[in-house]
Design a protein with these regions (language model features):
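Surface-exposed amphipathic alpha-helical segments
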Residues: 30-33, 127-156
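Sec-dependent N-terminal signal peptides
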Residues: 4-16
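Extracytoplasmic/secreted envelope proteins and their assembly/folding machinery
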Residues: 66, 70-74, 141-148
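Signature of long, low-cysteine stretches enriched in small and polar/charged residues
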Residues: 79-119
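Generic recognition of long tandem-repeat/solenoid scaffolds
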Residues: 41-49, 93-99
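Short, surface-exposed coil-to-beta transition loops
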Residues: 38-42, 53-55, 103-113, 122-124
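N-terminal "mature-domain start" segment
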Residues: 18-45, 82, 146-147, 151
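A short acidic-to-branched-hydrophobic micro-motif
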Residues: 46-72, 123-130
Length: 156
């Protein structure tokens, strides 16, 4: 009996701390992403490729906005990852922040993409790309649109 109660408690705990039902976790995993964080207010998943790494974070809150995500990248996340914030620009669809840093393989470039509007109320996206190549703004705009199309397809 104790084992059954323990199992139910653990199972309910797992379900109560999961991403909202409107996020298609199965599709995220089928598309080759690894889910790194899945709790009541945050879902983070990543994908490593030879030429680019992608880290996506979804924040589930009614108190967020794109300006807060941009400010957090500049003041918290870029320094935390030893990246130097250099510039930002905006497209019709997103704000794109640029940074760079050094790792064991040389210089890396980080690009933080924050959509201007959310697909679903209370779900804010942040897409972070890491690559060894500096990308021109036009290419970054195309990459941002492609990434946002894919990520937003996971939101029902």
């Amino acid at each position: 009996m104790k084992k059954i109660l323990l199992f139910l408690f653990l199972a309910l705990g797992v379900f109560s701390f999961a991403a909202p039902s409107y996020v298609d976790l199965n599709k995220i995993q089928r598309d080759g992403y690894q889910i790194d964080v899945n709790d009541v207010d945050t879902l983070a998943f990543s994908q490593e490729e030879s030429d680019m790494n992608l880290v996506v974070t979804m924040y589930f809150t009614n108190d967020g906005n794109p300006q807060n995500l941009k400010a957090a990248f500049k003041s918290v996340f870029a320094p935390q990852f030893r990246l130097k914030y250099t510039d930002e620009f905006e497209t019709n669809r997103a704000y794109i922040q640029k940074s760079f840093g050094k790792n064991r393989n040389g210089i890396v470039y980080g690009y933080n993409i924050v959509p201007k509007s959310q697909k679903r109320k209370g779900c804010f996206l942040n897409v972070f790309l890491i690559t060894p190549q500096e990308l021109p703004n036009k290419i970054l705009e195309e990459v941002a649109n492609t990434a946002l199309n894919e990520i937003e397809s996971y939101i029902k």
